[in-house]
């Protein structure tokens, strides 16, 4: 294996239990997003656009759809003979195997994969966040600070800071304290779960953590606090762009709706920072003459005979006559019958909604699971 300056390790094994029935059959990073993507596409595209050509994707929970989506990495230009993308499930031994015990244990189990490339730096990423970031700019910051570790942070409203891991820093952005979901936060710099480490430095801490039977083997709970206790040089890298942890139904719906804002800061149309994905071979979308579509994303393969307002339609969606869709996310290959009303809902892939049915209200978000058949109204 050729030596690499930096490689990326993407944590993509999360169950995503807060997404409920949307992750009953698939891992959270493989959940559809934004009309034609899956959530992990943003992290993979960031790697590609940042010039990082060696990526390990650590999978675990129901990985079939995720593994199939990633394939050999062609959409992200990661189908390479040297480096490229590698899917890394938990290791099996002669005596059996276990799931990854925590985020740090996931990296520890795959330390030999990292060693193959003898990197100077490793960037640890989450596969379930929506954002665009140039990791090489973060690496430059890391080098200039002569840091042992650099953690990307995002300013959140102070009244919401208690929901996050908060980094307390000095005037030079050196981290002097980490508080996990503090009741009375001292500032609003939330960890984004994006880390750059000097590999040899991180390896020592991972080995020490693996020997500690009382450890949760987690970066936030164990590795970072241990580094701070030993007075190592950790810095906060402030990120000012769009960032969303889509780990809940509410945040997933909000992130999709954000794309419909004319001035949204994510801007998936930026030709200088494209978001790549596996694009299905489908015919162009068809919008019937008596239909009406406003402020919506409608992608290839869709047939719209009804009305669609402020909604996101994925490939292969069929909207029947006299049907009205508002403020909703309709995932791939959903068939919606005639005279249907869908409000503020997320409809999972391959679901079927029969004629004359009402789904959702303008209050709470209604969710229909993948492959479900809706024969009666759902008003909640």
From Swiss-Prot:
What EC number(s) has UniProt assigned to this enzyme?
A: 2.7.7.27
Keywords for the protein's UniProt record, in alphabetical order: ATP-binding, Carbohydrate metabolism, Glycogen biosynthesis, Glycogen metabolism, Nucleotide-binding, Nucleotidyltransferase, Transferase
Q: Which residues bind alpha-D-glucose 1-phosphate?
A: 100, 165, 180-181, 191
Among the GO molecular function terms of this UniProt record, one is: ATP binding
CDD domains with a match to the protein in the record: ADP_Glucose_PP, LbH_G1P_AT_C
**Pathways per UniProt:** Glycan biosynthesis; glycogen biosynthesis
GO biological process terms, alphabetically, are: glycogen biosynthetic process
Q: What class of enzyme is it?
A: transferase
Instruction: Provide the reaction this enzyme catalyses.
Output: alpha-D-glucose 1-phosphate + ATP + H(+) = ADP-alpha-D-glucose + diphosphate
Subunit annotation: Homotetramer.
The text of the family note is: Belongs to the bacterial/plant glucose-1-phosphate adenylyltransferase family.
Q: What is the annotated role of this protein in its UniProt record?
A: Involved in the biosynthesis of ADP-glucose, a building block required for the elongation reactions to produce glycogen. Catalyzes the reaction between ATP and alpha-D-glucose 1-phosphate (G1P) to produce pyrophosphate and ADP-Glc.
Q: How is this protein named in the record?
A: Glucose-1-phosphate adenylyltransferase
Q: Which organism is it from?
A: Clostridium acetobutylicum (strain ATCC 824 / DSM 792 / JCM 1419 / IAM 19013 / LMG 5710 / NBRC 13948 / NRRL B-527 / VKM B-1787 / 2291 / W)
Chain's gene name: glgC
């Amino acid at each position: 294996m050729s030596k690499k300056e930096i490689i990326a390790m993407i944590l993509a094994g999360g169950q995503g239990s807060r997404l409920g029935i949307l992750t009953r059959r698939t891992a959270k990073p493989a959940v559809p997003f934004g009309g034609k993507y899956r959530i992990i596409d943003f992290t993979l595209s960031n790697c590609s656009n940042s010039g990082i050509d060696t990526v390990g994707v650590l999978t675990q929970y129901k990985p079939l759809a995720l593994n199939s989506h990633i394939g050999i990495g062609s959409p992200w230009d990661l189908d390479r003979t040297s480096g490229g993308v590698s899917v890394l499930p938990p290791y099996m031994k002669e005596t059996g195997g276990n799931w990854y015990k925590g985020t740090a244990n996931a990296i520890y189990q795959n330390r030999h994969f990292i060693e193959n490339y003898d990197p100077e730096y490793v960037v640890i990423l989450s596969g379930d966040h929506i954002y665009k970031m140039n990791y090489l700019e973060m690496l430059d910051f890391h080098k200039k600070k002569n840091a042992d570790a650099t953690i990307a942070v995002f300013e959140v409203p102070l009244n919401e800071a208690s929901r996050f891991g908060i980094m307390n820093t000095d005037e030079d952005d050196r981290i002097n304290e980490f508080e996990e979901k503090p009741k009375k936060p001292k500032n609003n710099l939330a960890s984004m779960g994006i880390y750059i480490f000097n590999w040899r430095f991180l390896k020592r801490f991972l080995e020490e953590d693996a020997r500690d039977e009382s450890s949760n083997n987690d970066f936030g709970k164990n590795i970072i606090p241990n580094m701070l206790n030993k007075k190592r040089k950790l810095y906060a890298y402030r990120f000012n762009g769009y960032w969303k942890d889509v780990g809940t139904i509410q945040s997933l719906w909000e992130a999709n709706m954000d794309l419909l804002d004319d001035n949204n800061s994510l801007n998936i149309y930026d030709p200088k920072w494209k978001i790549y994905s596996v694009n299905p071979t489908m015919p162009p979308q068809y919008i019937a003459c008596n239909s009406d579509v406003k402020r919506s994303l409608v992608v290839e393969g869709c047939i719209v005979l009804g009305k669609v307002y402020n909604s996101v339609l994925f490939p292969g969606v069929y909207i029947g006559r006299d049907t009205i869709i508002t403020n909703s996310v309709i995932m791939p290959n959903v068939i919606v019958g005639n005279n249907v009303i869908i409000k503020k809902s997320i409809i999972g892939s391959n679901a079927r909604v029969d004629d004359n049915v009402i789904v959702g209200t303008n209050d709470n978000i209604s969710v229909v699971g993948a492959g479900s058949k809706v024969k009666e109204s759902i008003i909640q």
